[in-house]
Amino acid sequence: MTTPRSFGPLGDVALLRGHAPYTLAGYAGFRAVIDTDGAVPARLKALFIAVAAIDRRYPELARRELARGASLGLTVRDATAGLIVLSSLRGEGAALEFADVIATVFDDSGAPPPQDLPHAGPGEAEANFLAYFGTIPVPLAQLMRLCPGAADAYYLMRRGSIDANPLSPKHGELLLLAILAAGYSPMAATHVRGARMAGATDQEIAEAVLCAVPAAGIAAWIGVGAMLAPD
């Protein structure tokens, strides 16, 4: 029996081929959405899958998907968007793991010269929070009260993830959503709103969330899907 490419490595598991036709058919259906151009380009969806895989600590899945993205035209600069978002959202360990994956996939992953580091001016963090959230969320209000320097640091990192991302702000938001969906995080609601503010359609949001399925299963959709229900 020929194994359709859309199964991915799951199709190589003899026990699944012999006992789980519904599972493989369903997975192939998800792959048909996330492996091809749709509302979101396939090369970016491969990046989203790779970064979600790092979130779930599956570096081999991440390497395979990043290589697939590169074959579709994904660049090192594009991949750096994942490195930036992981640094902010999941910390040093996840970011370094993804940096290793980037180095194995791209023959030339040379970086440009270092840039000067920005600083947050007085009131800059608060203004950014108000512009994005509409109000100061309680956790950030307490961070500003108890450790203002850390509040500035939070602002700089979230600005790097969205406004200064090598991708567009819209695709930066969608990348964040893929990670949050993979982690079944309630924070996804904030970035559904942020993605819409950045111009994303619900179809784009849906495809980004589905990019979490290879690493986190169909439960990744359940946590976010209800947020897309029409008002």
Predicted features by range, described:
Residues P114-P118, A206, L210-A216:
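Alpha-helical transmembrane segments and their immediate juxtamembrane flanks
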Residues M197, Q203-E204:
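C-terminal structured interaction module
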